Amino acid sequence: MLLHILYLVGITAEAMTGALAAGRRRMDTFGVIIIATATAIGGGSVRDILLGHYPLGWVKHPEYVIIVATAAVLTTIVAPVMPYLRKVFLVLDALGLVVFSIIGAQVALDMGHGPIIAVVAAVTTGVFGGVLRDMFCKRIPLVFQKELYAGVSFASAVLYIALQHYVSNHDVVIISTLVFGFFARLLALRLKLGLPVFYYSHEGH
């Protein structure tokens, strides 16, 4: 139940960030809803397609689409106050990342896949919504450039899978992973942590 509630909060927050990205590209209402939907539930859809997990999450639960579309339209109305809520969105985004990662890993495990595929599914669920958002908005995805985002998703998934072998209470496993991933993400933001950046400037290749 806790994970489901946090998931709904997560897709709402991600939908709003997607709507803002669409607004920066001066898209109409339809475009705003599409970008918001891709951001919020795109990662889970990519995961389900790769794993052959059908029906897709939003097909099985169409209320997710309604929640996301409503959040997108609401964002166009309250956009002027959004800059004042930046810290709130950072917190919600951190929670959403870990929740998406946990759900992605569990879907793969429930299908009988091993730890490696479960981690891949977790990272796909956690980051690919943002990747789709940035690609649709003609930007190099932020997750590929500077932020320690996919790394937090990866570490959270590894911890979640590992804890299941040592802790019998699944709620404890979920909460422990949430706490770890949440604070790891906020610490990465605070200290501006990121992976090494590769730069190649030779024009002949």
UniProtKB/Swiss-Prot annotation:
Its main location: membrane. It comes from the Bacteria. The keyword Cell inner membrane applies. Keywords: Cell inner membrane, Cell membrane, Membrane, Transmembrane, Transmembrane helix. It is a multi-pass membrane protein. It holds the Pfam family Gly_transporter. The chain crosses the membrane at residues 30-50, 65-85, 88-108, 112-132, 148-168, 169-189. The keyword Heme does not apply. It is found in: Cell inner membrane. Residues 1-29, 86-87, 133-147, 190-205 are cytoplasmic. GO terms for cellular component: plasma membrane. Residues 51-64, 109-111 are periplasmic. Belongs to the UPF0126 family. This is UPF0126 inner membrane protein YicG. It comes from Escherichia coli (strain K12). The gene is yicG.
